[in-house]
Amino acid sequence: ITTTLMGEVLKQAGHNVEYVQADYIAQFAGLETGDLHVAMELWETTAREAMDASFATGNVVSMGETGMMAIEEWWYPAYMADRCPGLPNWEALKDCPEAFATPETAPLGRYLGGPVTWGGFDDERVEALELDFEVVHAGTDAALFAELEAAYQRQDPIILWVYSPHWAPAKFEGSFVEFPPYSAECYNDPSVGINPDAAYDCGKPTGPIWKAAWSGLSEKWPDAAKVIENFKISNADAAGMVAEVDLNGKSIEDTVAAWMETNKGCLLYTSDAAD
């Protein structure tokens, strides 16, 4: 959605745009060779290492933040707050794991993590923070949020991995758990953090969602580069568009067009040159 929105803004500024699908990490190789020109949604939480490696080649440059902030963390519906007093402070989970238990995990609480391929170190986090929870991984992104939807409708116990921007925190009332703040040292040095004997005794990293481009972009299309650098969108606006597509069945193109019509005054671009 962010890519389409950026593309449509560029079109309004008089530029020709071609959309190319690329693997999340493999796209950096395309940017380095100049086969791809812009990547619009690089999460600090998952792409930092790949970004740094590409920037080091000199062939890829940062185009700044998108305005969105990446959040990936344990999340619980608002109705669970009464069942586990003290939330969103993580220490409340030490006192009420049974509030999140299921017949399969009792007496342990059940935490629904993302697919194993997402990483996230939730098993390590549970052990390091001495939480009486069992980590269960959803098979897919769709399965993760389908389970949330079903639990929310029945007011069933659930705590799970949610990320933002996404439609889930826009649709469902709830909160992210507040763990001890993330630091690289917390992940790498057991002596750092509240548990001196274990790493991962803190929350997941958060940070900006970035734009990146082939280093030759600003010379070949200077006006387009300015448009891309100026582009900003909020988590709320992005999540709203994701909800329109995923929940209401609208096409990405129609959703982007509607947002642009409503937010004409927010679009920053110049049109003194076109490609």
Language-model segments: residues:
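C-terminal capping/gating helix-and-loop segments adjacent to ligand/active sites or protein-protein/ligand interfaces
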Residues: 225, 229-259
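Ligand-binding pocket segment of bilobal, Venus flytrap-like solute-binding proteins
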Residues: 36-40, 110-188
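Short, polar/charged alpha-helical segment
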Residues: 1-16, 126
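Conserved small/polar residues in nucleotide/adenosyl-binding loops
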Residues: 269-275
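C-terminal lobe and pocket-closing loops
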Residues: 168-227, 231
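A conserved helix-loop-strand patch within extracytoplasmic ligand-binding domains
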Residues: 58-111
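Pocket-flanking alpha-helical
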Residues: 3, 20-58, 147-149, 167-172
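A bilobed periplasmic-binding-protein/Venus flytrap-type ligand-binding module shared by bacterial periplasmic
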Residues: 72-83, 207-220, 241-244
